[in-house]
Regions:
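Alpha-helix C-terminal capping segments
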Residues: 12-22, 205-207
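Conserved N-terminal subdomain of the carbohydrate kinase-like
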Residues: 2, 17-97
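Conserved phosphate-binding/catalytic region of the ribokinase-like
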Residues: 152-216
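Short beta-strand segments
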Residues: 63-65, 74-76, 102, 142, ...
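Conserved beta-alpha-beta core of the PfkB/ribokinase-like small-molecule kinase fold
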Residues: 96-157, 161, 168-170
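Short catalytic helix/loop segments, enriched in acidic residues and glycine
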Residues: 1-8
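Hydrophobic beta-strand scaffold residues
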Residues: 23, 49, 118-119, 162
């Protein structure tokens, strides 16, 4: 089974399911067969794509799942990301209720700050976040993933909310403290996309002006 992967794709799909509205997804794809397949599949899901096409291979990956439902992902190729220099419809960002950034440069953060709610992941790169000098509404990452672990001393501006997830153990929200994960009595098939789905739900709630202190 082969589908578009990565945080951006999953967040866009989950938001599309939650809101029943058209979701705009700004991304970069390689000008190859994989890039073309990604574009067609995501478009058929009802997602509005704004693509910066690159003369490089589209990044690929495969996921291995163990008997406990835990997954390990192997990635092949360079990570492609849109930049502010790409001729995309950046002007529509100011009309958005909420934006989640998974890959970009610092200038895109500045343009996206016009949205009511702006969230991101540390995987974007702390230097990219700091160089934007933008105050984030939410910084969401896994406290179990070495690629997303960070300390507040590494941030030039402290986000309004920072959430570090820890899978079935719940996680930590700053300010607020530790929270527990909801117990799921269903059979666990796999954990692929759980963190990205969580991030999509969080953005949806914040953009809907739900009180985050109550729901955590």
């Amino acid at each position: 089974m082969s589908y578009p992967a990565g945080g951006g794709s999953i967040i866009a799909k989950i938001l599309s399911d939650l809101t029943l509205n058209q979701i705009h997804f700004f991304t970069a794809l390689g000008n190859d067969d994989y890039g073309d397949k990604c574009f067609k599949i995501l478009s058929n899901m009802g997602i509005k794509l704004h693509v910066a096409w690159r003369d490089k291979p589209t990044r690929r990956g495969f996921s291995l799942i163990d008997y406990q439902g835990e997954r390990a992902i192997t990635v092949i190729g360079e990570r492609l990301a849109p930049t502010h220099k790409d001729k995309l419809e950046w002007n529509i960002l100011k009309k958005m209720d909420g934006i989640f950034i998974t890959a970009s440069d610092s200038e895109i953060f500045k343009m996206a700050r016009s949205a009511s709610i702006l969230c991101t992941t540390p995987r974007v790169g702390l230097n990219t976040i700091n160089n934007s000098n933008v105050l984030l509404d939410g910084l969401i990452g896994s406290n179990l993933d070495p690629g997303e672990v960070f300390s507040f001393s590494e941030l030039s501006l402290k986000p309004k909310y920072t959430i570090k997830t820890e899978g079935e153990k719940g996680g930590i929200i700053f300010p607020g403290g530790r929270y527990k994960a909801l117990k799921n009595k269903k059979l666990k098939v796999d954990s692929y996309g759980c963190g990205d789905s969580f991030a999509a739900g969080l953005l949806y709630g914040m953009a809907s002006k739900w009180d985050i202190d109550i729901h955590f």
